[in-house]
Amino acid sequence: MYSNIIVKKGIMMKRSYIREILDATEEDTISFAGGLPDKELFPLNELSKASKKVFKNDDCLQYSKSQGIESLREKIASIYTNKLGFKTSKEEILITTGSQQAFDIILKSLNSNQIIVESPSYIGALGAFKMLNKEIIDFKKLKELEKLVNSSNLLYAISDYQNPSTNVYNNKKRKSIANILSENNSTLIEDGAYCFLNFKNKIKAPISKLYSNSYHLGSFSKIVAPGLRLGWIRTKEENINKLLAAKESLDLHTSTFNQMLIDEYLNSNDLFEHISKINDAYNKKMEYMAKCFKKYIPSFKFKKPKGGMFIYGSFNSDSMKLAKKALKDNIAFVPAEVFYINKKSTEARFNFTNESYENIKLGIKKLANIIAKTQN
């Protein structure tokens, strides 16, 4: 456990480093840093056709309900019921401007000042929590979590292809976490950004299905297009009114046009057929990156993920120092230090979805040369 002051300084340093990566990125930079989907897989033609239909309705440019347009909420609720086995109604869905906004909305509606996170954890969530002056406590094992959870704090968890570790909670761990939360009457924020990105298209039911005092976050960013900034919160109906007050104070409502665009896209296309294509393409890219690591940097130890967008592993030395050297040679990746509250690390995260096959190979070969020069 770390003091609020130490954690705040640490988070600000990490955000500064993320900005350093972005600022230093040139056109010829090979970036394995961001969680960017493969733009070649964006359904441009389908969205273009959908947009023409949407523009025939002048309501697409009008204000709309803060909770989100009803037909889109119905479709999202149907995904929970039919694909996740988690019975859900449209009244239990709130549309957000990207799932990132969900952190702000939820935390402004709750009185919890302390948030428990898995170590390592998603930098975007850590940054959002600190901007709201929340105390962050991390844990590694469930025994630690049992001692930390109480009725006045909440747990933030990514149960599928965790960012950055790529870990997936098995059914036993999901049940254990639900039981721990239930025994202590705590609150769960479960981030489901990657839950559909399973290379074998096998979807697990979220922890939230097992525990009602929960908020499950979803997003179209990884499965349709991130630029539309469309996400959602799934929670019990009695929580929605509290969330609406916070949502209205932020942006009144999520873009009407973008909601209607996604809604029309879902009317005319099979979303899960599209997701299956994404998973097949990502699995091939992951295998290729893994092959390149084994060939050119065999000292980088990792386990191949079964889904998601990242390979996470460990070098023989401080990954932050290596990342800064690599950035000077226009190779970007994220050292794991930014995902920890206050810890140096040899671990690192590499995105395999954004760059081409050619650049994956070239980038890892260049990184291998940088490591060789460092060792000499």
Please report, for each region that a protein language model flagged, where it lies by residue.
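Conserved glycine-rich beta-strand-loop-beta hairpin in the small C-terminal domain of fold type I
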Residues: S121, D263, D280-A290, F300-S314
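N-terminal small-domain helix-loop-helix segment of the aminotransferase-like
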Residues: G10-T97, N267, A332, K373-N376
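Conserved PLP-binding active-site segment of the aspartate aminotransferase-like
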Residues: A33, T235, Y312-S317, F333-I370
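Inter-domain helical "communication" segments and dimerization helices
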Residues: F199, E264-E273, K294-S299, K321, ...
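Conserved core segment of the aminotransferase class I/II
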Residues: L210, Y215-D280
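A non-catalytic, amphipathic alpha-helix used as a structural packing/dimerization or gating element
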Residues: S71, K242-A245, S276-Y288, L362
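Conserved core of the PLP fold type I
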Residues: D59-N184, I189, C195-Y211, Y282, ...
